[in-house]
Amino acid sequence: MATYVLVHGGGHGGWCYQPVARILRAAGHDVYTPTLTGLGERSHLLRADIDLDMQIEDVVQVLKYEDLHDVILAGHSYGGMVITGVADRALDRIAWLVFLDASTPKNGESLADRAPPIMVAYEEVRTVDGVEVVLGPDSKTNPFLGVTDPEQLAWMTPKLTPHPWKCFSQPISLSNEAAVRALPRASINCTPTLKAKPPETRAEALDADRVWEIDTGHDLMLTEPQAVADALLAIAA
């Protein structure tokens, strides 16, 4: 039995992993899908001090209080920033890092540095309850998610929540970068995203112990949950 912790990306919540989590649990594995502070069902906690550090600590605390070890830790999109920081703080609890169409930051980089498309979202920056936020159900960046099925869109869109911009602009601080880089890692990429990456970033996305490419949109855990689950199951095999 494997233990999976699946970390969502910007504007999402743990809800986005429901289809994948069902498959993994049916196969007998433990699955945790934490929602980061200020998002999803925790959107009522939105406040000005939420940043990348806090959302990294959200997941570190799950590992600690659920007493999790040998974790297959996966992050989607912005979640790649989060899982990299989690591994830095809880190295001894991680068996694999899995990047789901995700950012793979170096020390001192922010998501804004790693993913230029997020700067399109910054054009929509607004203030909600005193917090600078981007994304949400009405964001013009939502087509990038690649969800086109009407039923999926009707289920997903109302659940998208504004995300504090500070999370995307704060550089990650890694104390154990070499050790984090030495962890086994897998990369599950979406074909359209991979093709759009600059050569250097594309090479980094393919530099992993296990690599998959799925021809689907960015929200692959919703559009291709079986393919994502199959890859995650293969990592545990």
Task: State what each model feature region is.
Residues 74-75, 79, 83:
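Gly/Ala-rich beta-loop-alpha elbow adjacent to hydrolase catalytic centers
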Residues 158-177, 192-194:
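Active-site nucleophile elbow and catalytic-triad environment of alpha/beta-hydrolase enzymes
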Residues 88, 92-137, 167-168, 173, ...:
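Flexible "cap/lid" loop of the alpha/beta hydrolase fold
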Residues 30, 38-71, 88-89, 116:
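Active-site loop/oxyanion-hole signature of alpha/beta-hydrolase fold enzymes
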Residues 2-43:
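Conserved HGGG/HGGXW glycine-rich cap/lid loop of the alpha/beta-hydrolase fold
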Residues 35, 72, 95-98:
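Residue in the alpha/beta-hydrolase core beta-strand immediately N-terminal to the catalytic nucleophile
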Residues 189-222, 234-235:
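Conserved loop-alpha-helix segment in the C-terminal half of the alpha/beta-hydrolase fold
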Residues 179-185, 206-209:
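Short, proline-enriched alpha-helix->beta-strand connector loops that line the catalytic pocket
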